[in-house]
Amino acid sequence: MKLHELSDNPGATKKRKRVGRGPGSGTGKMGGRGIKGQKSRSGVAINAYEGGQMPLYQRLPKRGFNKPNRKKFAVVNLGLIQKFIDAGKLDGKADITEDALVASGLVRRKLDGVRVLAKGDVSGKLNITVTGASKAAIDAVSAAGGALTVSAPAAAE
């Protein structure tokens, strides 16, 4: 057997249908597209339609939900607070409150409060009062001789 002697099984291939080539062809004029409408126009694809195969967005399981009244905190790292103190934008000797952080420009908006995280180092004794803080941040400030107080968020009016 040689390569040029190989052929497909009978019925394995179909001839391509030439569409829109006159009434004698059987698929002339409309070319199997019907009359008007989005599907009869060229260049139109229906989004997420996969040719009848179950679409990806339906194959994946539904999972989780978004809490409608979730609290959003402005996040600040200890290293940034220290950087602002070193630059003279924040007073390290006075109590550092959420309003002081906003006034210095470190936090743009308080949102539902400010949360302090432990990234960076603290080189002095700081007294910080905020709505939230990580355990590592509280430990880092107290190790430097300061105090990080977590106050309850103000009730919405």
From Swiss-Prot:
Could you provide one GO biological process annotation from this protein's UniProt record?
translation
Which keywords does this Swiss-Prot/TrEMBL entry list? Ribonucleoprotein, Ribosomal protein, RNA-binding, rRNA-binding
A GO cellular component term found in this entry reads: large ribosomal subunit
Q: Where is this region: Disordered?
A: 1-41
* InterPro entries, per database record: Ribosomal_uL15 (IPR030878), Ribosomal_uL15/eL18 (IPR021131), Ribosomal_uL15/eL18_sf (IPR036227), Ribosomal_uL15_bac-type (IPR005749), Ribosomal_uL15_CS (IPR001196)
- Which Gene3D superfamilies does the protein's record reference? 3.100.10.10
Q: Which domain of life is it from?
A: Bacteria
Q: Name one GO molecular function term.
A: rRNA binding
According to its UniProt record, which protein family does this protein belong to? Belongs to the universal ribosomal protein uL15 family.
* Assembly, per entry: Part of the 50S ribosomal subunit.
Task performed by this protein? Binds to the 23S rRNA.
* Name of the protein in its database record: Large ribosomal subunit protein uL15
What taxonomic ancestry is recorded?
A: Bacteria, Pseudomonadati, Pseudomonadota, Alphaproteobacteria, Rhodobacterales
Name the encoding gene, please: rplO
